[in-house]
């Protein structure tokens, strides 16, 4: 394992004779090499709101947490034989939620001890069958868990399941998000619908469809229309705006109050985005993946423009964005000497200039 801490310049290639690309809006501040234990697959990543802690979850049940500024070895803990489907830091950064999958899904809450390398399990809760996603509210008091056919709302102080919202989607859930104020929930189903909910009354407020392929150009003769669904969804902190990215890489944004479409961007070369790579900033902009999966870009929904936030040399496999979208961390992978190795990049967004 190697940790590099410091502000690094993002390098973006441009063709001969072309104007230099716009300066990225984020700086890469930390790189951690070879984050996985021997032979383990990394499926999820979490980044604390202040960027001081980064965690990965492995398919063998192991969780690893770094505090890059300390320069110490990572804390390694977890439950064997429970693949880590998702991780999430509470807004305070001193509570980590993990979702383990083995037959039934198990939510676990962890806290650091006196030593940065000592994390202890506070509590656990069985949440149901085929559960894959976690999302804290803005206060860290509620935690939403996405399962195949429902979303479970958990009171973190228990932890206790205080509500179960049964999905109205025709097929299984593919993505979800909980607004920071916990007053809106968004879900996506494999059939191509995206629904915004009032989680208190368990009532659907708006349903949008992303099922139609938006990829530019004509399909080759004889090929059927592709199935399209949202693989990422997000709500603005106050729940007034919603966004989605489809399996084709098309980006959508809507006004939740009126139900109107704010933005749609389809690109012929875009592909399915990395997991976790969508979040609204506190001022209403949208942080989303680049079309080539090698970075992130920031959408101004008023001007309907986007600017490069950061880019690297490898495709992002999975991304974690802080609750305020002020930073993000990405997992990349490569084969080195016949073994699969995962690295982590941590980026911080620079203050908006108003341009």
Residue ranges and their predicted role:
Residues 16-355:
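WD40-repeat beta-propeller superdomains and closely related acidic/aromatic-rich repeat-like regions
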Residues 4-14:
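Bacterial N-terminal signal peptides
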